[in-house]
């Protein structure tokens, strides 16, 4: 699958995860609705499903990974930043096929696309601290 299709999958996963975080609706229902409403012709749909469902299902575990490295309480994080961090931490912890630097760079790009003006710097700072704990060999 092309890297652009994976990038689009990450973008869609952040949007679906954001929706789930706000609505607390069923994970599968949001996925079905999201895929029905979006043009997914340029999306790696299987990767989207893995990222979204994996990040949502493992949200508490992912939150525990990031919490010690946040400059504020987890509850004070914006929904976009939380979604981006959850996707990145899911990739770092569960998708060993994704290179370390790719996961971090993609998260920064997602924050630039969807987050507040300076959120990409915050995301980078958190991931720079937590990623070596997840992947000590930086691979």
Swiss-Prot record:
SUPFAM superfamilies: NusB-like
Listed GO MF terms: RNA binding
Keyword Cell membrane: no
InterPro entries: NusB-like_sf, NusB_fam, NusB_RsmB_TIM44
GO BP field: DNA-templated transcription termination; transcription antitermination
Cleavable signal peptide: none
Alphabetic keyword roster: RNA-binding, Transcription, Transcription antitermination, Transcription regulation
Database matches in Gene3D superfamilies: NusB-like
Entry GO CC: cytosol
Pfam family, one: NusB
Source domain of life: Bacteria
Record-stated family: Belongs to the NusB family.
NCBIfam families according to UniProt: nusB
Function of the protein: Involved in transcription antitermination. Required for transcription of ribosomal RNA (rRNA) genes. Binds specifically to the boxA antiterminator sequence of the ribosomal RNA (rrn) operons.
Protein name, entry field: Transcription antitermination protein NusB
This protein's encoding gene: nusB
């Amino acid at each position: 699958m092309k890297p652009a299709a994976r990038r689009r999958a990450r973008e869609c996963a952040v949007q679906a995860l954001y929706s789930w975080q706000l609505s607390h609706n069923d994970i599968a229902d949001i996925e079905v609705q999201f895929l029905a409403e979006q043009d997914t012709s340029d999306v790696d749909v299987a990767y989207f499903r893995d990222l979204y469902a994996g990040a949502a299902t493992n949200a508490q575990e992912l939150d525990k990974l990031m919490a010690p490295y946040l400059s504020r309480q987890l509850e004070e994080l914006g929904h976009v930043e939380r979604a981006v961090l959850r996707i990145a931490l899911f990739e770092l912890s569960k998708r060993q096929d994704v290179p370390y630097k790719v996961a971090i760079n993609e998260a920064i790009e997602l924050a630039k696309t969807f987050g507040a003006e300076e959120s990409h710097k915050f995301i980078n700072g958190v991931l720079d601290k937590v990623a070596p704990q997840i992947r000590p060999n930086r691979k």
